[in-house]
């Protein structure tokens, strides 16, 4: 059985880690390279950087962050945000990232998933989906940092992304993001059952128990969190030890 992964997420804006609640109200959480090294030392399985800078300057800063992070950590890391072409992917991977995360750009031009997978391999392509509930057992895909409704069904889009060559799905429940009341279990379970690639659950982690719930009931392959790690509300080690006591296979 494959070990379940615990993944801290770092939202980076103009070279600083920030964390908001339901995609708004950002507050500063620290230096991305320092935080990445801390999580690598604490035995996180992977890291995800999401560049939420709006400006070209901010994007250039991100390449610098990736290069410094790559030199300082020993675990794989994914970078997403503002990646719109194979050239963008090349720039990020050359700077030291292991995987690319595509969100809005993939919804606007799904062929980008295939292009990236063809050049770099499916294992490098993570498709991030921001999902909001629109009724019983129905979720809609949102883009542009959770601002724009697309009318697209989340489960169908996850299946399409897999067919185009995505190697992984990063699934954020917008309804639960930042609330710390638990992951979107039904959403995660439905998507996990609908695709044959790993699903990383995101949005809602507040307690160690929430990780257990989403990795078992939600059938996720990995669970991601931000603020509870950034602000030392719990640690990677504490989450992993708890999961081990509950019989969940994790890397030590």
From Swiss-Prot:
Where in the cell is the protein located? Cytoplasm
GO molecular function terms noted in the UniProt entry: imidazoleglycerol-phosphate synthase activity; lyase activity
Source superkingdom: Bacteria
Q: Which UniProt keywords apply?
A: Amino-acid biosynthesis, Cytoplasm, Histidine biosynthesis, Lyase
Q: What is its main location?
A: cytoplasm
Q: What is its EC number?
A: 4.3.2.10
The protein's annotated pathway: Amino-acid biosynthesis; L-histidine biosynthesis; L-histidine from 5-phospho-alpha-D-ribose 1-diphosphate: step 5/9
Reactions that this protein is recorded to catalyse: 5-[(5-phospho-1-deoxy-D-ribulos-1-ylimino)methylamino]-1-(5-phospho-beta-D-ribosyl)imidazole-4-carboxamide + L-glutamine = D-erythro-1-(imidazol-4-yl)glycerol 3-phosphate + 5-amino-1-(5-phospho-beta-D-ribosyl)imidazole-4-carboxamide + L-glutamate + H(+)
Is the Lyase keyword given for this protein?
Answer: yes
Name a single GO cellular component.
Answer: cytoplasm
Q: Please name the InterPro entries in this protein's record.
A: Aldolase_TIM (IPR013785), His_biosynth (IPR006062), HisF (IPR004651), IGPS_HisA/HisF (IPR050064), RibuloseP-bd_barrel (IPR011060)
Q: Which residues cross the membrane?
A: none
Q: What CDD domains does UniProt report for this protein, alphabetically?
A: HisF
What the entry lists under SUPFAM superfamilies is as follows: Ribulose-phoshate binding barrel (SSF51366)
User: What Pfam families does the annotation carry?
Assistant: His_biosynth (PF00977)
Active site residues of this protein: 11, 130
Matching NCBIfam families? hisF
Family named by the database record:
Belongs to the HisA/HisF family.
Q: How does it assemble?
A: Heterodimer of HisH and HisF.
What is the recorded function of this protein according to its Swiss-Prot or TrEMBL entry?
IGPS catalyzes the conversion of PRFAR and glutamine to IGP, AICAR and glutamate. The HisF subunit catalyzes the cyclization activity that produces IGP and AICAR from PRFAR using the ammonia provided by the HisH subunit.
Instruction: Please report the name of this protein according to its UniProt entry.
Output: Imidazole glycerol phosphate synthase subunit HisF
Q: Which organism is it from?
A: Brevibacillus brevis (strain 47 / JCM 6285 / NBRC 100599)
Gene name for this UniProt entry: hisF
């Amino acid at each position: 059985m494959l070990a379940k992964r615990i993944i801290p997420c770092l939202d980076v804006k103009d070279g600083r880690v920030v964390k908001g609640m339901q995609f708004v109200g950002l507050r500063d959480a620290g230096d991305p390279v320092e935080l990445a090294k801390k999580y690598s030392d604490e035995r996180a399985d992977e890291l995800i950087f999401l560049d939420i800078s709006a400006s070209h300057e901010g994007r250039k800063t991100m390449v610098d962050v990736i290069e410094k992070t790559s030199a300082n950590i020993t675990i794989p890391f994914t970078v997403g945000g503002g990646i719109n072409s194979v050239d963008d992917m090349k720039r990020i991977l050359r700077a030291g990232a292991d995987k690319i995360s595509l969100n809005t750009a993939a919804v606007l031009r799904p062929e980008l998933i295939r292009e990236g997978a063809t050049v770099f391999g499916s294992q490098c392509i993570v498709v991030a989906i921001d999902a909001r509930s629109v009724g019983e057992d129905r979720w809609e895909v949102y883009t542009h940092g959770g601002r724009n409704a697309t009318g697209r069904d989340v489960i169908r889009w996850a299946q399409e992304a897999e067919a185009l060559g995505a190697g992984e799905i990063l699934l954020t429940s917008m309804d639960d993001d930042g609330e710390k009341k638990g992951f979107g279990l039904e959403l995660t379970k439905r998507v996990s059952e609908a695709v044959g690639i790993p699903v990383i659950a995101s949005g809602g982690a507040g307690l160690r128990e929430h990780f257990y719930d989403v990795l078992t009931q939600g059938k996720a392959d990995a669970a991601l969190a931000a603020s509870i790690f950034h602000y030392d509300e719990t640690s990677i080690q504490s989450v992993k030890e708890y999961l081990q006591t509950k019989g969940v296979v994790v890397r030590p």
